[in-house]
Amino acid sequence: LPWINPSPNMRNLTQAILYPGIGLLEMTHLSVGRGTDTPFEIFGAPYINHLELAEELNRLNYPGVRFVPIQFKPTSSKFVGETCNGVNIILTDRENCPVVNLGIAIAHTLNRLYAPNFDIQNFNRLLKHPEAIKELERGQSWERITASWQSEIEDFHIRRKPFLIYK
């Protein structure tokens, strides 16, 4: 099937896969790559040390991704014309990369390294989970936060099963 953009800023499958996790970061003081050729595959801000961030994120050994330090200048959206320091997310295994949890892991790392510039409170504008924000502010691990949702996710999968039309 030919690719049809589901959104003007979602131009390929990688961006569509990463969007549910990286899109959560949009309301913070961070560019998610809008105004570049690779929205949702990159993110950054002028206040970030891109080398440090890539090293810290790669240290997570998160499944299905690796992070490459980059600098970019968005032509629209946040930080127009400013040099943003950040990372390029290389999707290595889309089948085994829980992207919403990836967004939480990235937010945890950004908050640890760059609070208050990162603005964790605005992360909740899309996450809509105030308890998770409190846990992130307290420095709770992202693994523990996302694990606390597991039973609710399993319940949802059971409830939705009768409505799935494709396997």
What feature does the model see in each segment?
Residues L1-I22:
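Conserved anion/nucleotide-ligand pocket segment
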Residues S7-L13, G35, E56-L60:
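A generic short-segment signal for beta-strand/edge and adjacent turn/coil regions
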Residues S7-M10, P39-F40, G64, I133, ...:
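Generic secondary-structure boundary/loop-capping signal
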Residues L18-P46, G86-I90:
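C-terminal accessory domains and tails appended to enzymatic cores
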Residues T28-H29, T36, Q71, S76, ...:
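Solvent-exposed, flexible loop/coil residues
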Residues G44-S148:
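Conserved functional hotspot residues or short segments at active or partner-binding sites
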Residues D155-K167:
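Structural signal for terminal/edge beta-strands and the immediately following C-terminal loop/tail
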